[in-house]
Design a protein with these regions (language model features):
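Terminal, low-structured helical/coil segments at or just beyond the last alpha-helical repeat
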Residues: 17, 23, 195, 199-236
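Alpha-helical segment of the N-proximal tetratricopeptide repeat
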Residues: 22-56, 60-63, 67, 97
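Structural marker of alpha-solenoid helical repeat scaffolds
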Residues: 50, 84, 118, 152, ...
């Protein structure tokens, strides 16, 4: 009897020392912040061993896999999170991001639409959906999403730049030039923006002097695609 009590006491001690589900999850998040993604995944798997219904652990594991560029595995993990609980925008948004990286733009838009329906206050959804719509060449819808982003933050240089690309695709060089000017004012190191600005000024408006100045700026910033334009059109 004493021996049995001894083993019961030992087991109780072991169980009391075992980390809880929340402690394991929190450690996984800490490892994520430290960019130790594989170790984080191991902790999220331990959470799921304790509780296979933990939707947050599936979502967090998916984020860690995404950071490792394991997009298919990330999509699988986000899908499991959604299957457990479809009331949060996060796994839909995150799965959309994985589809975006895979250039599966249509699937990305569907997930972003669902995420947006669950929480319309998340500006990142509009920006990333704009990128996916740009990839689908749905330029007017992309412009709408980038405008929503810019209403909240007019100084978002990437939103200005991608709006310009959508405007060019939508055959609006006037609007594109305005957005590109806004871009280079906000980010003077964006060689691609100077390049697009220069090309548009020259090809759409015949502004050779201004266009060449911007193409040369793009080249100076290391944007090599500008070289052929500078060589062909900007030599004195």
């Amino acid at each position: 009897m004493k021996k049995n009590l001894f083993w019961i006491a030992i087991l109780a001690f072991v169980w009391s020392c075992s980390p809880s589900e929340q402690e394991l999850f929190d450690e996984g998040l800490r490892l994520m912040e430290a960019e130790e993604y594989q170790k984080a995944i191991e902790y999220f798997d331990r959470v799921l061993e304790k509780n296979p219904e933990n939707t947050s652990a599936y979502n967090a594991k998916g984020v860690a896999l995404f950071q490792q560029t394991k997009y298919d595995a990330a999509i699988s993990s986000f899908t499991k999170s959604i299957e457990k609980d479809s009331s949060s925008y996060k796994p839909f948004f995150n799965r959309g991001n994985a589809y975006l990286e895979k250039k599966a733009f249509r699937e990305a838009v569907l997930d972003y639409n669902t995420a947006n329906g669950l929480d319309q206050s998340q500006i990142d959804i509009y920006y990333n959906r704009g990128l996916a719509l740009l990839g689908l060449e749905q330029y007017e819808d992309a412009i709408f999403d980038f405008d929503v982003v810019l209403q909240g933050n007019p100084d978002n240089s990437l939103a200005q730049f991608n709006k310009a690309k959508a405007q060019l695709g939508n055959n609006d060089p006037v609007g594109a030039v305005e957005s590109l000017f806004n871009t280079v004012i906000l980010d003077k190191r964006n060689g691609a923006a100077y390049y697009l600005l220069g090309v548009t000024q020259m090809s759409a408006f015949g502004q050779k002097e201004d266009g060449c100045a911007n193409l040369k700026m793009a080249l100076n910033l290391g944007f090599r695609e500008a070289k052929s334009w500078v060589d062909d059109f900007c030599q004195e």
